[in-house]
Amino acid sequence: YVMPHMNDGGSVIITSSVAGLTGSPNASAYITSKHANVGIMRALAAEMAPRKIRVNSVHPSPVDNRMMRSLEEGFAPGAGAEVKKNLENAIPLKRYATNNDIAQAVLFLASDESRFITGVTLAVDGGMTVV
């Protein structure tokens, strides 16, 4: 942990996944690990608050990057484009997140603009977790 080395004040951001906020079949180990991120984030937010260290988590939906393209092909070899289309259709904004979308959310949580926010899960998911 970095927290013992932090002076009083600061921000810790845990990157998780929308899987940490929901459940779905055939992914229990992955979903369990992402829900664990939420639990440790909330515990640390409570523990670190007296030192004015804020702890939050971001939960991206699928992100348009090389890793996701590899996963799409892994889900259905030769049908990656169809997998992507199906996943995008499950997102109300009808697109994957971008790396920049996630970076901007992290930047906000790290900034003084969020100085009174701790212990929250920020879904960066185009509405995926609300439907």
Model region roles, listed by residue range:
Residues 22-28, 50-51, 94, 112:
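Active-site loop immediately N-terminal to the catalytic Tyr-X3-Lys motif
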Residues 78-79, 91-102, 113:
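A conserved structural motif in NAD(P)-dependent oxidoreductases
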Residues 4, 46-50, 115:
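Alpha-helical segment proximal to the catalytic Tyr-Lys
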Residues 13, 55-58, 68, 119, ...:
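Hydrophobic structural elements of the Rossmann-like NAD(P)H-binding subdomain
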Residues 33, 41:
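Active-site helix of classical SDR
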Residues 38, 55, 60-74:
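Short, flexible catalytic-loop segment of classical short-chain dehydrogenase/reductase
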Residues 17:
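Residue(s) in the substrate-gating loop at a strand-loop-helix junction
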Residues 22, 106-107, 118-131:
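Short C-terminal tail/terminal secondary-structure segment
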